[in-house]
Amino acid sequence: ASAPRFKQFITEVTLGDVELAGFLQRSCGLALSADVTEHALWMHFGAGSNGKSTLLTILSELLGSYAGPAPVDMLLVKGRSKEAENQFASIAGKRLVTNVETDEGVRLSEATTKLLTGGDTVQARARYGQPWPLAPTWKLNIACNHKPLVRGTDSGIWRRIKLIPWLAKFEEGTANLSLMDELRAELPGI
């Protein structure tokens, strides 16, 4: 199956930037596998109405139960608690894990980001359950209008963060209101 509308969508959202389009398509392809050797957090950022949520939604629909949302604050700095292990349990078995719309000015937890992108087994626990070792299969994707703050300057965090700028703008009159249906029709080819 082919997906010409999906390819056109990628060209549109990257404003014809061939290198960015290729990078974006590779990140989509990686989301299909359980391979975590990339050790990455894909951070899609840019003002609204640019296609980033559309892409993550269509990939989530393509992957079905292999995709799911992360708790909104899972990757953010907050009081350290046992809740983190419960949050990790929510992404067990996922290939694509999405997190959308962080508030402006929030800080990314570098320790949690490194833990969840490092390829090592983490400890997870269902609420009131026993902890278990959880081998990573997920690719973390954040879609945000405002990039979370990152204080670290070491390569350990910055080599993991893959910044994907979304500069296109589809406003009233130029937005394709049937785009999701067009992309859904091509799911087998995507």
Feature annotation, model-predicted:
Residues 1-93, 162-165:
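P-loop NTPase catalytic core of nucleic-acid-dependent motor ATPases
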Residues 55-58, 108-116, 156-160, 178, ...:
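Alpha-helical scaffold elements adjacent to nucleotide-binding pockets in ATP/GTP-utilizing enzyme cores
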Residues 70-84, 111-131, 174-182:
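Substrate-gripping "pore-loop 1 plus following alpha2 helix"
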Residues 84-93, 124-143:
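AAA+/SF3 P-loop NTPase mechanochemical coupling elements
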Residues 94-117, 132, 150-157:
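Conserved AAA+/SF3 P-loop NTPase catalytic/coupling segment centered on the Walker-B
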Residues 100, 141, 161:
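Hydrophobic, well-ordered secondary-structure elements that form the walls
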Residues 103-104, 145-150, 167-171:
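Conserved nucleotide-binding/hydrolysis micro-motifs of P-loop NTPases
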Residues 134-137, 153-190:
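Phosphate-sensing "switch" segment of ASCE/P-loop ATPases
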